[in-house]
């Protein structure tokens, strides 16, 4: 593949990631968003280097920044660069990028479906684990019962995460396959 083709391919992938991140600004059901799909797609097509992490995570961060400061902010709210527990959420995105980089070296429908399910599971497990000790005042006891209660409390949101990851993964990967 020529240098020009690689540049065009990267530009298309980046454009699709930015477009998917911008879709978060459209009202949606809880957790029915493209964030897992963005991380998976970036991991699959941006190679195993810093771009695979930086581009999807920055696109998600910029959409979070806009949502938190322009859409969800109430009058008098302080300007927010991040939110409580952000490192758990963004850590899960980094793990999803890794999943995409390794699972989707060669893209297939089955691998995209498996990757999407894996992305949902990673986000659910990591973000809820971060909620367990991270609430002030504490909501969950600092033992296995508290952790299990935290995961049980997160189950209603898993459906939106799973559907969003699946729908947006299929959309991103299928669109890219048609363009490519």
For every predicted segment, state its role.
Residues 2-46, 50-55:
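Hydrophobic transmembrane alpha-helices
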Residues 10-15, 50-54, 87-91, 113-117, ...:
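Hydrophobic alpha-helical transmembrane segments
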Residues 14, 29-46, 66, 86-95, ...:
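Membrane-embedded alpha-helical segments of multi-pass membrane proteins
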Residues 17-25, 57-71, 120-129:
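Aromatic-anchored segments of alpha-helical transmembrane domains
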Residues 22-29, 74-83, 102-106, 155-158:
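Membrane-interface helix caps and helix-loop-helix hairpins in membrane proteins
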Residues 76-124:
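Short helix-perturbing small/polar motifs within transmembrane alpha-helices
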């Amino acid at each position: 593949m020529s240098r020009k083709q690689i540049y065009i391919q990267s530009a298309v992938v980046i454009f699709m990631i930015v477009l998917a991140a911008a879709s978060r600004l459209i009202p949606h059901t809880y957790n029915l968003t493209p964030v897992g799909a963005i991380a998976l797609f970036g991991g699959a097509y941006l190679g195993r280097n810093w771009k695979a992490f930086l581009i999807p995570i920055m696109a998600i961060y910029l959409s979070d920044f806009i949502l938190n400061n322009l859409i969800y902010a109430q009058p008098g709210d302080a300007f927010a660069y991040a939110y409580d527990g952000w490192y758990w959420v963004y850590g899960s995105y980094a793990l999803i990028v890794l999943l995409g980089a390794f699972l989707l070296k060669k893209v297939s429908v089955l691998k995209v479906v498996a990757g999407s399910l894996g992305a949902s599971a990673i986000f659910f497990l990591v973000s809820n684990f971060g909620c367990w000790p991270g609430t002030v005042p504490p909501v969950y006891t600092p033992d296995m019962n508290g952790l299990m209660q935290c995961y049980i409390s997160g189950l209603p949101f898993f459906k939106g995460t799973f559907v969003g990851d699946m729908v947006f993964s299929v959309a991103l990967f299928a669109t890219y396959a048609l363009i490519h």
